[in-house]
């Protein structure tokens, strides 16, 4: 898995009046998309996550979308977002931020057990937080940077 870079006549030469953003995302004729992608044996490219959302736990790359796809299989979960949070031993560990469907309940042990049966050990979230709604931008995209701000260095809210 690597970062997807693209080039062609339809690609922007850079960001308008933002030289720092251009310098970090444009290299020659190539635009760094910020997408984590893989190619199969036939050359088809699959986007697996956003590069900036990946975190490293114990030296292993964890792509939150993979963990979120497992979490969405739990019938109690309406929405899920996984972020990396600091950990003294592993560098970072996963925190699953969940929104439950109305009238549902879910405990940490059930989530951990479910994930442990379907994911490599280092991908299983270290903890969960249940909140009312995930922060989103105007187009509906989950704002993981807001979740990171909310949960960095603070105790995870009690699970109800």
Segments and roles (model prediction):
Residues 3, 8-9, 13-17, 21-24, ...:
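AMP-binding/adenylate-forming catalytic core of the ANL superfamily
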Residues 29:
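FAD-site-proximal beta/loop scaffold in flavoenzymes
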């Amino acid at each position: 898995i690597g970062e997807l870079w693209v080039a062609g006549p339809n690609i922007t030469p850079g960001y308008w009046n933002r030289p720092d953003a251009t310098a970090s995302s444009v290299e020659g004729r190539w635009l760094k998309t910020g997408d984590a992608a893989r190619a199969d044996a036939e050359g088809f490219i699959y986007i697996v996550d956003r590069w900036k959302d990946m975190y490293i736990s114990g030296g292993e790359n964890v792509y939150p979308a993979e963990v979120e796809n497992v979490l969405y299989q739990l019938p109690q979960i309406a929405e899920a977002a996984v972020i990396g949070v600091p950990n003294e031993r592993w560098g970072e560990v996963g925190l699953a931020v969940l929104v439950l469907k109305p009238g549902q309940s879910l405990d940490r042990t059930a989530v951990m057990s479910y994930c442990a049966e379907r994911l490599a050990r280092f991908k299983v979230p270290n903890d969960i937080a249940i909140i009312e709604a995930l922060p989103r931008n105007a187009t509906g995209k989950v704002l993981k940077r807001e979740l990171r701000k909310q949960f960095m260095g603070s105790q995870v809210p009690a699970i109800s």
